[in-house]
Each structure stands twice: as structure tokens, then as C-alpha cells.
Design a protein with these regions (language model features):
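N-terminal structural segment of carbohydrate-active enzymes
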Residues: 1-120, 128, 135-139, 150, ...
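Hydrophobic faces of well-ordered beta-strands that scaffold small-molecule active sites
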Residues: 2-4, 51-53, 121-123, 233, ...
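Conserved, mostly hydrophobic/aromatic
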Residues: 6, 53, 89, 114, ...
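The substrate-binding groove and active-site-proximal loops of carbohydrate-active enzymes
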Residues: 13, 17-33, 85-104, 199-214, ...
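Loop/helix patches that line or flank the sugar-binding groove of alpha-linked glycan CAZymes
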Residues: 14, 18, 61, 77, ...
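Aromatic- and acidic-residue-enriched segments that line the glycan-binding/catalytic groove
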Residues: 59-86, 127-192, 277-284, 375-388
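Active-site-proximal helices and loops of the catalytic beta/alpha 8
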Residues: 142-145, 153, 160, 220-223, ...
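C-terminal beta-sandwich/jelly-roll accessory domains of carbohydrate-active enzymes
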Residues: 464-531
Length: 531
């Protein structure tokens, strides 16, 4: 599984200029119809198997639409609003439709185009919290609104959908709420700070029973979208929802739609196995270990010798761990806060793509070196692409084919395409870490993928200069992978901030193989020392 994450709000925006804190009229907005069949097929050709359309569900916004209940601007972050302050679980965000009244039809068309292009579709499921002004006008007949039957005089009741602060009033600007409800990030009082998720209300799963109101309503929402043809759900802040709920809900969906896949945003490594084995998740974010370590290697100079212990800590569940270097929450790889340049991030991306046996995710714009250094309004110059503002990004126009890529951007996208093609070839092959046999390597990471005559030696170079180095191949690797060559050191040249790949061939007489070309186009002499 190789996922391409993209915000439809940004991708197809036709505007060429932006005003800080601007409205949708001033700054424009992408639409679902902007994802043409040609563009989707191009993504499939680049090596992606799934596309995660981020922000499809209707959410709180400062934009006012006829026949849709408006939101108080004081409880909306940014003019566009956060896609994770969901206002109606059963509806599509009106910003994303060419014709607002036809937004459901346009979504169905997007789903059909994606499938026709060979891409499976992932959408957000935000189970922990909703927008404070949650109004579901698209729910199927007979569905009771969240909170409609709550006893608001109780702080907690297993039958309530929300948590309440009786006799307390929430005041945020001109917005008041009485009794106050708990905020999404577990603030159980009426005084959230600007750094809290004050624009959201936390949902109550405390009934701990499939018969509880919240469990039933949230499971029905998953079933609804699965029945529309959605192939997977990226479950926001899944660890803030009891694992027992996931055990129930995922089983309910898979009993009717066994092809659907569930991805969990979980940051606590102590919870990983429970959310996989009991909760039923297919995949989990590997941020607290893998992402954080690779980032420290790139940005902080941490030794590459630290990488093996990270993957070893999740070795028993490694096929379930989703690797990434960018997403909407994290700073861009090419930003000054991370690698500072697109090229400097390439070795980390090569490691993430080629050593793992689980899924990989790329964030739209990453493949052409987007830096995320625009101050859009609610978001500042923080190395992230804003999820709160309307904005006209040059990288989005380029990806949509409305502006030409620079030669550097084109070369980087070709690099990503080549990397993903190699990743596909290596799918399902054994992995063997060579770092224990090469303790002198601190800015390179060496490993094997494959078996027998199809085994490849892969070295990623985190150094800013080309290196020519010797990689020792231990006897255990030769026997374990049934290699056709003898153990011994191999000399390999690796370009600056890049990776090189060599296929291990049978050892010729006298211990020398002919000159050959590596995957990255560097001519390498491979010397095999036969004991």
C-alpha cells in the first residue's frame, strides 16, 4: 500500500494570488471535479495505490452557504476551518463542490474516477470530537442527532453522547454554551485556552457497550461510507477512543465490507499491539519511533546506528506500521525546520520506502519539494501547509498541470517515481539490516532486500557529499538469504543525499566482479573478498 495524501481544498485551486486570512472568494478553493481521470491515472502511474482525500466531510467554516446553518466565527480556526471539526458526518464539505447542491453527486463521481484510475479511496473518520456547532442535516431518516437525547444535567452518563460541565458556561468571544461541553483534547471544564481544541466537543464512549448510543451512531457512520464505496478510513486520534469500541466497529464494517482497511493515528507505542490485535486496525502511524528517529538523523545529526533499534522495537508488528515523512500535521521535509532542502530529505525517504514491509505515505507537494513557508492567515510561517486557510499555492497549480514544474521539481518527482517503482519490485521480499556488521557507518544506512539471486544491497547516504564506502556482508546474511555471493566487504559509491542499489551476483573467479551500474546511475566497482 502506497498512499498519496491530498487536500482537495488546495489541490485544484485556480487562483494565482492569496491574501492573508482571505475568504474563499478572495483566495479561491479547489474542487472535487479538479481531480481529472488523467491526473488520477498519472498518480497511479507514479506508483501510488491509494489516495487519501483529506477534509471531505462537512466541517465548521466561516464561509456562509444558503440552506446550511452558519458557524460562529469565534469557534472556527481560520476562514476555511479545520477539516477535523466535523459539522456533519453524513455530508460532504460544500467548499469542495462546483455546485453546492450537487456535492454528493460530485463526491460519487470522484469516487468512481479514482476507482477507474486504479486508486483505492481513503477518507477521514474523526471519532473523538465534533465541531461545537454540529448540525447533521444529511443524516439518513431515523438517525437521532448527536446529543439530542443527552441529560445535560449530568457530567457523565453512559447514555450521553457528550460530557457536560453542569452549571458552567463556555464563553469564547461572542459564542456561549451552557452547560459547557468538554473540549476535544480532554479539557473537562469550561475554560479551554487558545492552544486547546476549543472549537470541538469530545464524544463520550463511556458506555463501554455496543448498545450505547455513541457506539451505535459512530459505527453506523462507518457503515454508511463503506456502503458508498469508500475503501479505507484514516481514523483521527484513534488512541483517544477506547480500543473496545474499535474492536466492535471494525468487526461490524469488515463483516459486510471485508476489503475496507483501517489506519489509526496512534502515538503511544505502548498501545500499538492492543489497537492492532484487539482493536482490529490494519495499520498504525509509526511516528513516535520511526518518523521521529529519521527526522533526528536528518535534522539533528543523530547517528544512523540508531535506526535498527527503532524498527526492532516493532518487529513483531512491522507489516502494520505506516511509514511517512510528511503529513498535514508535520512540518514539510524541505522546510528550514526539517531537512532545509528537498535533496537533503531523499535518503530518509529512501529508507522509509525501501526497508519497510508495511504501507508508505507521501503528502501532496512532497514529491516536488514544497517547503510550507507561507503565512496564510491563521497559520504562520511554520513549515506546514495550512489546513485552516484558503490559499492559492503554486505547488498545487503545478501538480494540477496548470503551471510548469521547474527542472529541479521535475527531477525530484522523477526521483520519487523511480523510488516507488523499486519499492513495488521489492514488495514481499525479506529485509536484512547490515548496520550491526558495519558499526563505523554513522551517516549511511545499509541493508539488504530480496533473496537468492534477486537480493539487492541498498545504501542511503545522509551525508552532503558523495561517499565511497565499504559495506561488510556477514556470513549470516549469506546463509539466511541464500545469497549467490561470498561474505566479505563490498565497495559502493553513493551520491550525496541519495541512495544506491546493487544486485548481488554470483562471485566470479579471483573475487572480482565487473564494473556495473547502480539503481541511482552511479558506476560502482564491487569487490568480493572470498575467504
Amino acid at each position: 500500500m502506497t498512499i498519496y495524501q491530498v487536500l482537495p481544498r488546495l489541490y485544484g485551486n485556480r487562483h494565482t494570488t492569496g491574501i492573508q486570512g482571505g475568504t474563499i472568494r478572495q483566495n479561491g478553493c479547489g474542487k472535487m471535479l479538479d481531480f481529472s481521470l488523467k491526473a488520477l491515472r498519472a498518480l497511479r502511474g507514479q506508483g501510488y495505490t491509494h489516495i487519501w482525500y483529506t477534509g471531505l466531510l462537512e466541517h465548521a467554516t466561516q464561509t456562509v452557504y444558503p440552506d446550511i446553518a452558519p458557524d460562529n466565527p469565534d469557534i472556527v480556526k481560520g476562514k476555511a476551518g479545520s477539516p477535523y471539526a466535523v459539522k456533519d458526518y453524513y455530508d460532504i464539505d460544500p467548499d469542495l463542490a462546483r455546485r453546492v447542491a450537487d456535492r454528493r453527486a460530485e463526491f460519487c463521481e470522484l469516487l468512481a474516477r479514482s476507482h477507474k484510475a486504479g486508486l483505492k479511496v481513503i477518507m477521514d473518520f474523526v471519532p473523538n470530537h465534533v465541531a461545537r456547532h454540529y448540525v447533521s442535516d444529511a443524516a439518513p431518516q431515523g438517525v437521532r442527532p448527536l446529543g439530542a437525547d443527552d441529560d445535560t444535567a449530568l457530567h457523565f452518563s453512559p447514555d450521553n453522547n457528550f460530557y457536560y460541565c453542569p452549571d458552567e458556561t463556555l464563553r469564547i468571544g461572542s459564542y456561549t454554551e451552557s452547560p459547557a461541553r468538554a473540549s476535544g483534547n480532554d479539557v473537562f471544564h469550561a475554560h479551554p485556552t487558545p492552544d486547546d481544541w476549543y472549537e470541538t466537543c469530545k464524544l463520550n464512549y463511556g458506555g463501554m457497550s455496543p448498545q450505547s448510543s455513541t457506539w451505535q451512531k459512530m459505527t453506523d457512520i462507518l457503515l454508511y461510507w463503506a456502503e458508498q464505496g469508500v475503501d479505507g478510513f484514516r481514523c483521527d486520534m484513534a488512541e483517544m477512543v477506547p480500543v473496545s469500541f474499535w474492536h466492535h466497529a471494525i468487526a461490524a464494517v469488515l463483516s459486510r465490507h471485508p476489503h475496507v482497511r483501517f489506519i489509526a493515528e496512534v502515538y503511544n507505542p505502548q498501545l500499538y499491539r492492543d489497537y492492532i490485535r484487539h482493536g482490529g486496525f490494519h495499520y498504525l502511524y509509526d511516528k513516535a519511533g520511526f518518523y521521529d528517529t529519521l527526522r533526528a538523523v536528518v535534522a539533528g545529526g543523530l547517528s544512523t546506528q540508531s535506526i535498527p533499534s527503532v524498527w526492532q522495537s516493532t518487529d513483531d508488528i512491522r507489516p502494520h506500521m505506516l511509514y511517512f515523512l510528511e503529513n498535514h500535521d508535520e512540518q514539510r521535509l524541505a522546510s528550514p525546520f526539517f531537512a532545509s532542502a528537498p535533496q537533503a530529505g531523499r535518503p530518509a525517504m529512501a529508507v522509509a520506502a525501501l526497508m519497510g514491509t508495511g504501507p508508505l505515505m507521501v503528502y501532496s507537494g512532497q514529491e516536488i519539494g514544497e517547503r510550507g513557508m507561507t503565512a496564510e492567515g491563521y497559520s504562520g510561517q511554520d513549515g506546514r501547509t495550512s489546513i485552516f486557510d484558503y490559499w492559492a499555492y503554486p505547488f498545487c497549480r503545478k501538480l494540477a498541470g496548470r503551471e510548469a514544474l521547474t527542472p529541479e521539481e521535475e527531477a525530484l518527482r522523477e526521483w520519487y517515481t523511480s523510488l516507488l517503482q523499486l519499492r513495488r519490485k521489492l514488495r514481499g521480499t525479506p529485509f536484512y539490516d547490515l548496520m550491526y556488521a558495519n558499526p563505523a557507518l554513522t551517516r549511511q544506512y545499509a541493508f539488504l532486500r530480496g533473496e537468492g539471486r534477486e537480493t539487492r544491497l541498498i545504501v542511503a547516504n545522509f551525508h552532503g557529499e558523495e561517499v565511497r564506502l565499504t559495506v561488510r556482508l556477514p556470513r549470516h546474511a549469506v546463509s539466511f538469504l541464500h545469497l549467490p555471493c561470498a561474505p566479505g566487504p563490498y565497495t559502493i559509491a553513493v551520491p550525496a543525499h541519495d541512495y544506491a542499489v546493487l544486485t548481488l551476483e554470483p562471485s566470479p573467479p579471483f573475487g572480482h566482479s565487473p564494473l556495473r551500474r547502480s539503481r541511482r546511475g552511479v558506476r560502482d566497482t564491487v569487490d568480493t573478498l572470498i575467504p
